[in-house]
């Protein structure tokens, strides 16, 4: 009797795991389908940062630009300027306040920078996240326990119009980005080329080197 019960429980667990994996695969496929419907766009964004207790601690504005495949640019204008650029192979982060540039490969950065997924169809990128869907909201959770990120939410309708996205970090702090003034087409590939500004320190995490231009 105990053996039969154990086998039944094991079978139920396997079915549950298979069902969850199937649901996850469906959610990934649907999110990718929606993202692929719009190949390029430009939008303004409003950012709201909240503490783990839900208190607003900062707000900001900037511009978000995408060109598939694998190119995106997030240019934060306020309250403090910074720039994130994916050129398809590398992810660049520039902080003009401290005059520092950090660069990593897209492959290594995707675990902590899920924005990469908004322009990527690379299976190795998507395999780093569990994905679930609730209507027009998709919830992505990194599989790696080493990730600084707890959750990434994407709000996108069936026509492929991205409404916004949000991140929740391990410490509970959240960042909400709401897109507005969205326009499609006319996004120059030159926007996704990055050169280290003169005088800026370069932290090259692709090889662990630091240098100054």
Curated annotation (Swiss-Prot):
Keyword vocabulary terms for this entry: Chaperone, Periplasm, Protein transport, Signal, Transport
InterPro entries linked: LolA/LolB/LppX, OM_lipoprot_carrier_LolA-like, OM_lipoprot_carrier_LolA_Pbac
Subcellular location: Periplasm
Pfam families: LolA
Superkingdom, taxonomy of origin: Bacteria
A GO cellular component entry from the record: outer membrane-bounded periplasmic space
Signal peptide location: 1-23
GO biological process: lipoprotein localization to outer membrane; lipoprotein transport
Cell membrane keyword on record: no
Gene3D superfamilies reported in the protein's UniProt record: Lipoprotein localisation LolA/LolB/LppX (2.50.20.10)
UniProt main location, coarse: periplasm
Entry function: Participates in the translocation of lipoproteins from the inner membrane to the outer membrane. Only forms a complex with a lipoprotein if the residue after the N-terminal Cys is not an aspartate (The Asp acts as a targeting signal to indicate that the lipoprotein should stay in the inner membrane).
Quaternary assembly: Monomer.
Family indicated by similarity: Belongs to the LolA family.
Protein name in UniProt: Outer-membrane lipoprotein carrier protein
Organism per entry: Actinobacillus pleuropneumoniae serotype 5b (strain L20)
